[in-house]
């Protein structure tokens, strides 16, 4: 376990890999050498990082299958990103989580639509009642008996003495 965390050991392994590649490939001007070295470096780093992580995870976890599956999916996704692909590998658990999230969002939107349509129906009913109250109903004969200013009006025949009490009798002028 000490060798896994030892930086000198890691650097010496990388140097050994580079020396081996240089000895195998005699032509130093080869165009693919940097790419091969990069891929081997990434693979070596993944190897060094994943083995201790897997050992610790398997010892501490109760469900080793899920841990292994998660580690493999992560490694494959890393390799796909390094290769330039934008697609990712997903597990069934992730797909189910995304589907649950989508279904919850759809339910929330349906509830919102239901609330909005209920409010709109209530508003339309209220507007109809207001419209019905505001409609002018035509009346053929106007009944003026209920008007307050028409109650005490008397005709000439109804007056006691037969003459208009509001007409002045004499005209007097002040001097």
Curated annotation (Swiss-Prot):
Gene Ontology molecular function: channel activity; metal ion binding; toxin activity
Localisation: Host rough endoplasmic reticulum membrane; Host membrane, Host caveola; Secreted
Biological processes, Gene Ontology terms: monoatomic ion transmembrane transport; symbiont-mediated activation of host autophagy; viral process
Positions in coiled-coil regions: none
Topology in the lipid bilayer: Single-pass type III membrane protein
Transmembrane region(s): 29-51
Tagged with keyword Transferase: no
Main localization of the protein described in the UniProt heading: host cell
Record carries keyword Transmembrane helix: yes
GO cellular component, one term: extracellular region
List of residues binding Ca(2+): 120, 123
Keywords on record: Activation of host autophagy by virus, Calcium, Enterotoxin, Glycoprotein, Host endoplasmic reticulum, Host membrane, Host-virus interaction, Ion channel, Ion transport, Membrane, Metal-binding, Secreted, Signal-anchor, Toxin, Transmembrane, Transmembrane helix, Transport, Viral ion channel, Virulence
SS bond partners: none
Intervals, Cytoplasmic compartment: 52-175
Sites carrying sugar chains: 8, 18
Post-translational modifications: The N-glycosyl content is primarily Man(9)GlcNAc, with a small amount of Man(8)GlcNAc.
InterPro entries: Rotavirus_NSP4
UniProt domain comment: Binds 1 calcium ion per tetramer.
Family classification: Belongs to the rotavirus NSP4 family.
Quaternary data: Homotetramer. Interacts with the immature particle in the viroplasm. Interacts with host CAV1, early and late in infection. Interacts with host integrin ITGA1/ITGB1 heterodimer. Interacts with host integrin ITGA2/ITGB1 heterodimer. Interaction with microtubules blocks trafficking to the Golgi apparatus.
The protein's name: Non-structural glycoprotein 4
Biological source species: Rotavirus A (isolate RVA/Human/United States/WI61/1983/G9P1A[8])
